[in-house]
Design a protein with these regions (language model features):
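Non-catalytic, polymerase-adjacent accessory regions of viral genome-replication enzymes
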Residues: 1-46, 401-408
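Active-site-proximal segment of RNA-dependent polymerases
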Residues: 3-7, 90-148, 218-219
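Short, conserved non-catalytic motifs in the polymerase core
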Residues: 29-35, 60-84, 100-112, 173-195
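Amphipathic alpha-helical blocks
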Residues: 37-61
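Conserved polymerase palm-domain catalytic core
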Residues: 44, 51, 124-266, 270-285, ...
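Right-hand nucleic-acid polymerase module
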Residues: 78, 87, 213-257, 277-281, ...
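A common structural junction motif
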Residues: 287-296
């Protein structure tokens, strides 16, 4: 894989540090730390640039905060100058690395957030119903606390050969004591999580290259056939078995060529497929890959099921022909609206205060729910937006004098 080695010169530019300040302070100019930094902006940016060039910048001590929604998580917070330094490096590195990420990686990638992830799943389920009857959903057990430092450094070196930059990134990684662990809460931590898993995405797409090893193909083909026979329950299963051993063998080898519908949102992996027996083998391979290549653990609460029962991922529950919102999010919205109504607030004010949850829920098929809550916000047609209305009655014709008075 081709590597790039001339990042430091592009990073150590005053224009880049001004850009980094803009990114780090976006929508936060009211904070005291940013106001103080901005009061002597030229000197502060020059000091950060100098410390990067000379390798004297050291990550500040973390402050910690525990959040409990949606689950308990320890957030590591750094002073504002650290964020500017991180952004200065990311301005040059992020886009270069993003080109290496799988097109089916969502979350933390510009233009590919949770809603793009949701739209992709909806599109695939409707376009390929026969090939997406079943699903596998899994994630990493305590991802951030178990990130392995040597593995992360190795992943960075697959694309970067600028030793000066690598030493700066290594210092940030090692600012967390021990050989494992990373604190969410900074843009750079989010970027590191993407780098950590980007090779996994490509290997997963190719079924971890099992098809390239004849011994593994023979072993897993035998297991696939045996488990297909042992788990057959429906008429469709028995119909497939009646086609013979050779048919099952060829079908399994065809599956090994490529996983067409696999997606990742943060550390959540979703695979849509037509065969649950094959998915049970895939989850075994994922667990082995995590343990051997990434030194992390698979969450034992993985799930394989039928799409008709609903795929609960990214805050939504996907079905073949519609999308519902996760019950937890629906209940949270209902309770928030009930609390605001008790205060006697008008609907417009309630809609404004609950706009975040309403906006999230609107992406699912929830028009009935919003109508019951009195929070419906119908989307206007283009004609309504620009004020065009149909003209009723006859159109008045110009008189002869008006025609004669018109010149070309």
């Amino acid at each position: 894989m081709r590597r790039k080695g001339d990042f430091s010169g592009d990073i150590a530019r005053k224009e880049n540090y001004y850009k980094a300040f803009d990114h780090a302070s976006k929508n936060k100019h009211g904070k005291k730390a940013i106001t103080k930094f901005e009061a002597d902006l030229e000197k502060n940016l020059s000091d950060l640039l100098y410390s990067f060039e000379n390798g004297t910048f050291v990550t500040s001590p973390y402050r910690f905060m525990t959040v409990h929604e949606p689950k308990k998580r320890l957030i590591g917070m750094l002073p504002f100058p650290d964020h500017v330094q991180h952004w200065a490096m990311l301005n040059e590195v992020e886009d270069y690395f993003t080109r290496s990420f799988s097109a089916y990686t969502y979350g933390g990638v510009r233009g590919r957030g949770p809603h793009a992830y949701m739209r992709m799943i909806r599109k695939v389920l409707r376009k390929y119903p026969e090939r997406t009857t079943d699903y596998l959903l899994c994630d990493i057990h305590h991802f951030y606390p178990t990130v392995n430092h040597p593995v992360l450094k190795s992943q960075l070196r697959t694309r970067i050969k600028d030793n000066h930059l690598l030493r700066r990134l290594d210092e940030i990684i090692d600012s967390v004591e021990g050989d494992t662990g990373m604190f969410p809460g900074t843009k750079l931590a989010q970027f590191f999580s993407l780098v950590y898993l980007y090779l996994f995405d490509h290997d997963l797409k190719r079924c971890f290259h099992v098809g390239e090893c004849p011994a593994l193909v023979e072993y897993y083909t035998k297991r696939y056939i045996e488990e297909s026979i042992a788990t057959a329950k429906t008429e469709h299963d028995y119909e497939e078995l009646s086609k013979g051993i050779q048919y099952l063998s060829d079908r399994f080898k065809g599956y090994l060529n490529r996983l067409d519908f696999c997606y990742r949102l943060a550390d959540d992996v979703l695979i849509l497929h037509e065969d649950t027996v094959f998915l049970h083998l895939v989850i075994e391979w994922i667990g082995l890959y995590y343990a051997n290549e990434l030194r992390i653990g698979l969450n034992p609460r993985w799930k394989i099921g039928h799409v008709t029962d609903g795929v609960d991922t990214g805050g939504y529950v996907h079905f073949p022909d519609h999308v519902r919102v996760r019950k937890r999010n629906k209940v949270a919205l209902c309770r928030q609206i009930a609390r605001l109504r008790k205060k006697g607030l008008p609907d417009e004010e309630i809609r404004r205060r609950a706009s975040s949850r309403i906006g999230f829920i609107q992406h699912a098929d929830t028009s009935n729910l919003l109508n019951k809550l009195g929070m419906e916000t119908p989307r206007k047609r283009l004609g309504q937006v620009i004020g065009i209305k149909k003209v009723r009655g006859r159109i008045s014709r110009p008189t002869g004098n008006e025609i004669r008075g018109y010149t070309l």
